[in-house]
């Protein structure tokens, strides 16, 4: 039961500031990515979008895996999965439908085709249900990578039930679970000099590489939501998965274990940032979004805007008002 409820950030007697900080950083970067992912001609924003991709959904999936158990689901545990993940998925889908109707006059209820960003709520229960069986494999992460690569050859695996993304981000979920079992523990331990230097080099290298390829990268490669459209598709996806793993591990190694004022506290609302931000961004983007950001100072102000929006969504007042969307099964206690 513990592994199920921990799939989402939860209120506990003693919170882990390390994971809360990671949640908040990752959620903020997801919000930033969705705010700017249509601005392909703003070099600064494109660079930051590419450089931080490994720290967004790959990290969210990894954290979910860390807090998951490979124990078989009981009936009560399966019910809890449905209430904590599938019910929010339906609620969020309805809210997205209503918002789209309000903005465009068109109605579309998101069920088999997840609403913007909501695919993660569908993937989590699938990963959790599959974990007891996947854990029996000798090298589950390797098998998951193979499944992610094969998925690109199946045309009908795409947006339907987010199957492509569910398969393609499964390696990160399983990696998180393996880390909880002790994998790479020595390298990720604070104070290990060589791994700390390697992590700094990885993130610095990601920044340099992102700048060098900022005009060549197709954002669809990072989303991994569709079938391959070229012969080089499998190699590109393998490179994306590798970059995600290396970048996520680098973040885990460098993140301070101690509580960071304000940031760690906001991290308790990390899932609120992830679930709610599309509902906040859609009206903004409908009116032009941040297309005004052209100069470098203006592009920097977009980053500040993303941080402000993320802080607001993760704040206690917002959690008290919106608990019924993100965590309906736990009522208002989760937002206190």
Write out the residue ranges for each language-model feature.
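Alpha-helical transmembrane segments and their immediate juxtamembrane cytosolic regions
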Residues: 2-336
């Amino acid at each position: 039961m513990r592994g199920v409820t921990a799939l989402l950030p939860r209120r506990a007697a003693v919170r882990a500031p390390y994971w809360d900080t990671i949640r908040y950083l990752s959620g903020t970067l997801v919000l930033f990515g969705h705010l700017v992912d249509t601005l392909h001609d703003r070099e600064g924003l494109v660079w930051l979008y590419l450089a931080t991709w490994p720290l967004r959904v790959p990290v969210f999936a990894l954290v979910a895996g860390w807090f998951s158990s490979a124990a078989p689901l009981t009936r009560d545990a399966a019910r809890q999965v449905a209430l904590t993940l599938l019910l929010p998925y339906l609620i969020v889908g309805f809210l997205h439908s209503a918002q789209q109707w309000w903005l465009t006059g068109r109605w579309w209820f998101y069920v088999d085709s997840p609403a913007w960003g909501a695919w993660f709520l569908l993937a989590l229960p699938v990963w959790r249900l599959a974990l007891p069986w996947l854990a029996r494999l000798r090298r589950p992460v390797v098998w998951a990578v193979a499944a992610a690569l094969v998925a690109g050859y199946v045309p009908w695996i795409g947006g339907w039930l987010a199957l492509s993304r569910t398969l393609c981000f499964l390696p990160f979920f399983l990696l998180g679970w393996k880390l909880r079992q002790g994998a790479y523990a020595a390298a990720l331990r604070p104070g290990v000099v060589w791994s700390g230097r390697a992590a700094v080099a990885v993130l610095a290298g990601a920044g340099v590489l992102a700048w060098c390829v900022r005009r060549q990268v197709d954002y669809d490669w990072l989303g991994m939501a569709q079938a391959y459209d070229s012969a080089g598709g499998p190699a590109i996806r393998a490179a994306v998965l590798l970059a995600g793993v290396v970048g996520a591990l680098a973040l885990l190694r460098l993140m301070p274990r101690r509580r960071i004022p304000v940031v760690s506290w906001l991290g308790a609302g990390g899932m609120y940032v992830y679930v709610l931000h599309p509902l906040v961004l859609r009206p903004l983007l409908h009116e032009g979004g941040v297309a005004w950001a052209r100069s470098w100072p203006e592009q920097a102000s977009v980053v500040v805007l993303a941080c402000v929006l993320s802080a607001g969504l993760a704040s206690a007042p917002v959690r008290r008002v919106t608990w019924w969307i993100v965590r309906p099964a736990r009522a208002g206690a989760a937002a206190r």
